[in-house]
Curated annotation (Swiss-Prot):
A single MF term (Gene Ontology): ATP binding
GO BP of this protein: coenzyme A biosynthetic process
Amino-acid positions noted as binding ATP in the UniProt annotation, renumbered to this chain: 95-102
Subcellular location: Cytoplasm
EC number annotated for this UniProt entry: 2.7.1.33
Keyword Magnesium applies: no
Name recorded for this polypeptide: Pantothenate kinase
InterPro entries, per database record: P-loop_NTPase (IPR027417), PanK (IPR004566), PRK/URK (IPR006083)
Family of this protein: Belongs to the prokaryotic pantothenate kinase family.
GO cellular component, one term: cytoplasm
């Protein structure tokens, strides 16, 4: 089979960096270098060039999809003779720990909110839907955070279902990485945004990923456009370890940090601890529960060194 024939067999259109960047068309840059610096994660290099070449074309594509979805809603309202409720367009972002999901989510939130339509964009992470530590300890799951069993999936599904049903105010629990737990009474209210970005390890998973807790609908059933942020496993491990080292010098030094004891480690000890955490927990979760969902995504961003995206795959 020729390469051309193979390319026709895949459900994705594939773009290298320059091909994708050309699809920006004339979309203006609406973020300053200072704003971009504030959006990036602790262990990432996010440049003006990266936003211009990767995220501006993506925001243009999403704007087309969102506008098309609004027209479809208007057609339905005209057919029914009703004034419909405001239904958010839901974008999900999945990928491994340390791949840069949160940065992708924050950049898209900033860009999409600055389109001429001035749409309201909310960002929610699924970390808030992890069971509280008290529950995880009772169930012996503290070392399985991020695995399917660790999430309150019924609450997460109800959250997205209520949003898609037009509920005026929906609450989401909020997670603190400082205390490594859900914040008691710290719920965030989401009030019918135009766009909701849902970021987390598990947003592409379906019912077959939760055989222990069967239910008829799943988060992915309510998502309009899904993104998977991908990278080679060796880079993911390096990024995870480097992020751990930066936390050791920063967030872990806070006496209130759940991981405060790690701040006392030497660099060599910290590397050993981070490597063990990666191999025993995060790598296992990636291989068993996250990576198998990649091909369910509408779009796959593949990163190389320095968190730079070098390939984009868009579902046909």
């Amino acid at each position: 089979m020729s390469k051309k024939e193979q390319s026709l067999m895949t459900p994705y259109l594939q773009f290298n960096r320059s091909q994708w960047a050309a699809l920006r068309d004339s979309v203006p840059m609406t973020l300053t270098e200072g704003e971009i610096a504030r959006l990036k994660g602790i262990n990432e290099d996010l440049s003006l060039e990266e936003v211009a070449e990767i995220y501006l074309p993506l925001s243009r594509l999403l704007n087309f999809y969102i506008s098309s979805n609004l027209r479809r809603q208007a057609v339905l309202e005209q057919f029914l003779g009703t004034n419909g409720q405001r239904i958010p367009y839901i974008i999900s972002i999945a990928g491994s720990v340390a791949v840069g999901k949160s940065t992708t989510a924050r950049v898209l939130q900033a860009l999409l909110s600055r389109w001429p339509e001035h749409r309201s964009v909310e960002l929610i992470t699924t970390d808030g839907f992890l069971h509280p530590n008290e529950v995880l300890k009772e169930r012996g799951l503290m070392k399985k955070k991020g695995f399917p069993l660790s999430y309150d999936m019924h609450r997460l599904v109800k959250f997205v279902s209520d949003l898609k049903s037009g509920a005026p105010n929906v609450t989401a629990p909020v997670y603190s990485h400082l205390i490594y737990d859900r914040i008691p009474d710290g719920d965030k209210t989401v009030a019918q945004p135009d766009i909701l970005i849902l970021e987390g390890l598990n947003v592409l998973q379906s019912g077959m990923d939760y055989p222990h807790d069967p239910h008829h609908v799943f988060v992915s059933d309510f998502v309009d456009f899904s993104i998977y942020v991908d990278a080679p496993e060796n880079l993911l491990q390096n990024w995870y370890i480097n992020r751990f080292l930066k936390f050791r010098e920063g967030a872990f030094t806070d006496p209130d940090s759940y991981f405060h004891n790690y701040a006392q480690l030497s660099e060599a000890e910290a590397v050993n601890v981070a490597t063990a955490l990666w191999n025993e927990i995060n790598y296992v979760n990636l291989k068993e529960n996250i990576l198998p969902t990649r091909e369910r995504a509408s779009l796959i961003l593949t990163k190389s060194e320095n968190h730079a995206v070098d390939q984009v795959r868009l579902r046909k």
